C-alpha cells in the first residue's frame, strides 16, 4: 500500500518547490506514473487480500475504486488548466496542493482496516472538497452549495460516530477483518434498528439517497471542473463502498430494514430520470443522472446477493468514468460559450467535430449501450432485483428507457441543429482536451474486454 501512499505524499512538496513553468508538467507526469503503478492492485485473483497490514489493506472491492481514484488525479489536473490560467502561481499551487491532499485522504479511506480510522478519513475528504467548491467555484451561489454539502454530510455522519462507539464498547474492536467473523447476530429490537439506521444514513446521504440528494445538484453545478469530476467519480462511491463494508456486519437486520429504502430508491430512480428530461442546465442534468444511477447501486447493495454486489461494483466504476467525462465535455462547452444552458449551445457538431465524437461516446456509455461496463452493471442489478421481486422489472426497465431518452436528448440538443450566431468564432478543441477525453473513454472500452476485474470479492 505504501508504494502509492508515499509517492502521493511526495507530490505535496513537489507542488511547492517546482519552478513555475514546470508545475503542471511535473505534477501531471508524476501523478500519472503513480496511477499506472496502482494498476497492479487490479491483479488480485481471489478474495483474500495479498496486500494488507494492520493499518491499510486492499481487496477486490477496494482495488478498482483505488485505481479509479489514482487515475482521476492527472485527469482533474489536466482539466483545470484553463480554469486556473488567470490565477497567480501561488493560488495555482494551493489548488494543486488541495487536490493532492484530497487524493491522499481518499486513498487512505479506501484502504483503512479500522472503521474509526475509515470514519475520520471519510470526514477528512469533506475539508479539501469544501475548499475547492467555495474558493474556485464560478458563481456566488457556491457558498450556499458549500453549506448544503457541509451540513448534509455532517448531520448524517454524527449518528455513525455514536454507532461506531457503541460497537467498539460491545465488541472491543472495529477491525474489519475481526468483525467479518463476528458470529453474534443483532437482535430484531428497536435499539438494533436505530443502530442500523445510524450506520447506514451517513452513506445514504453521501450516495445520495433520493430525498437526501438536494446537496448534490447544487454542489455539482457550483463546483469548478476538478470538484465536479471528483464528486461524481469518487466521493459518491465512498458511500457505496462504506455501505458494502458495513451491511455485511449488520446482517441479518438488513433484510428487515431495507424494504422502505428499496422502495424509495426505485421510486427516486424514476423521478430523477424524469427530472433529467426537464433540465435546461447541462451540469444539472448530469448531476441528476448521477442520482438516478446511484439509486440503482443502493438497491443492489441492500438486496445483499453476490450478483447484486457484482453489479454495484461494476456500475460504480463505469459511472465514475462516464460522469467525469460528461462533466469535462460540459466544461469544454462552458469555457467557449460561457453558458451552461443547452438551448444556447446548439449545432456544435459542425464547429467542433472531434469533440462531437467524444459527446457521442460519452452519451452512449451513459445510456448503457452494449457491450459497455455500464450495461453489465445495470444487467446484473436488474437480474438481482428481479429475483428479489418480479414487479421491479417494470421500474428498472422504465428507468433504462428514460435514461436512453435523456442521454440522446442531451446529445441532440448540444450537437445537432443550427448553430447560433454568437458561436461562429469558437476556439478549436485543444490536444489537452482530446487527450483528457480519450483517457476517460479508453479505460471504459478496455474494461469491456475483461470486466471480471471490477466485479468485486463475490466474483
Swiss-Prot record:
It is an enzyme of class 7 (translocase). One of its GO terms (biological process) is mitochondrial respiratory chain complex I assembly. Pfam families: Oxidored_q5_N, Proton_antipo_M. GO terms for molecular function: NADH dehydrogenase (ubiquinone) activity; ubiquinone binding. Its EC number is 7.1.1.2. It is a multi-pass membrane protein. Its main location: mitochondrion. Belongs to the complex I subunit 4 family. This is NADH-ubiquinone oxidoreductase chain 4. It comes from Lepilemur septentrionalis.
